[in-house]
């Protein structure tokens, strides 16, 4: 086995590194998927625990993550430029359906993505209003905000950001861009512009949270279809896993965690059978597909102190029956 240190990642502090990888209950000759390669922290640690017969397939839709993955020269490793919802197609292509010993997902935006102003993810840094994980596909946030209605934007802000002032913020954004058309001025095109506009639209300020936090989250989730991607993966993951294969998923906000928690709970219960029927235990447990492993895990105080961005992370693990 290789040492973990030989695979150190310099740019990004990986959240719940040991907990998430330990959740996979690695077999040294196993086949694993890291569905969110990012800057490779989890992948490098997994590789350090595998024998020469082990295998790791990593997936990411961010071109910069793919470039980082190409730095790993290891015959046990391969990278796929795709979103994790396409893991079933990748497994089919590689003849690995039902043979995967574990799938790991880290649903957070990586620190480099947040810190690179030109990606447009952060209201703390001025940059183009992009927000796409894969900058080669789909509409940017700027392009979408030019054409969205107040009603649709309000829905996005409420649904994906749980923003209490969604209607007020949506109206301010749409009115700004309508005014730009009318007066021949510039559309919203910078993260700093959007953050300032949101700040002006919100009547009450939370001193512990920037007024634009929820709106930026909501727009990013919508632009990247993040919850649709997660739902698609969850619906297909069981077919990819071998018996006793594990799902280890880190989420960073309540919408994602709710989906993961509900999925694991539902798949661990088996058939819904009316109470009181004289059935054997094996009949009651028929169709039970997952076993939940332990309780949800959150970062320690020490990890949060070392990496404040980890504070909202929640890890859930389940095993294929």
Swiss-Prot record:
Gene Ontology process terms (BP): rRNA base methylation
The protein's enzyme class: transferase
Pfam hit, one: Methyltransf_5
Record's subcellular location: Cytoplasm
EC number: 2.1.1.199
GO cellular component, one term: cytoplasm
Binding site residues for S-adenosyl-L-methionine: 40-42, 60, 84, 106, 113
Catalytic activity: cytidine(1402) in 16S rRNA + S-adenosyl-L-methionine = N(4)-methylcytidine(1402) in 16S rRNA + S-adenosyl-L-homocysteine + H(+)
UniProtKB keywords: Cytoplasm, Methyltransferase, rRNA processing, S-adenosyl-L-methionine, Transferase
Classification via HAMAP family: 16SrRNA_methyltr_H
Homology family: Belongs to the methyltransferase superfamily. RsmH family.
Task performed by this protein: Specifically methylates the N4 position of cytidine in position 1402 (C1402) of 16S rRNA.
NCBIfam families: 16S rRNA (cytosine(1402)-N(4))-methyltransferase RsmH (TIGR00006)
Record's protein name: Ribosomal RNA small subunit methyltransferase H
């Amino acid at each position: 086995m290789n040492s973990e240190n030989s695979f150190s990642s310099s740019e990004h502090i990986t959240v719940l590194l040991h907990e998430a990888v330990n959740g996979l209950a690695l077999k040294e000759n196993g086949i694993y998927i890291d569905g969110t390669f990012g800057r490779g922290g989890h992948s490098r640690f997994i590789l350090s625990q595998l024998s020469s017969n082990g295998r790791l397939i990593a997936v990411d839709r961010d071109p910069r993550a793919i470039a980082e993955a190409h730095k790993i020269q290891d015959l046990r490793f391969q990278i796929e430029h795709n979103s994790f919802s396409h893991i079933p197609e990748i497994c089919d292509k590689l003849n690995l359906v039902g043979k995967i010993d574990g799938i790991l997902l880290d649903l957070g935006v990586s620190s480099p993505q947040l810190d690179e102003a030109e990606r447009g993810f952060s209201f703390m840094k001025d940059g183009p209003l992009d927000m796409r994980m894969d900058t080669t596909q789909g509409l940017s946030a700027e392009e979408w905000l030019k054409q969205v209605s107040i009603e649709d934007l309000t829905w996005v802000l409420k649904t994906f950001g749980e923003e209490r002032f969604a209607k007020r913020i949506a109206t301010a954004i749409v009115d700004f861009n309508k005014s730009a058309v009318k007066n021949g001025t510039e559309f919203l095109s910078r993260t700093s512009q959007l953050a300032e506009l949101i700040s002006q639209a919100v009547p009450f300020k939370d001193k512990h949270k920037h007024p634009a936090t929820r709106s930026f989250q909501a727009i990013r989730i919508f632009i990247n279809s993040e919850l649709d991607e997660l739902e698609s993966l969850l619906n297909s993951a069981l077919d990819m896993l071998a018996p006793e294969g594990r799902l280890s998923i880190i989420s960073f906000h309540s919408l994602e965690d709710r989906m993961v928690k509900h999925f694991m709970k539902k798949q661990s219960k088996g058939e819904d059978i009316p109470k009181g029927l004289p059935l054997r235990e094996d009949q009651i447990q028929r169709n039970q597909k997952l076993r939940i492993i332990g309780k949800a895990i959150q970062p320690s105080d020490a990890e949060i102190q070392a990496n404040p961005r980890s504070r909202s992370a929640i890890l859930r693990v389940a095993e294929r029956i």
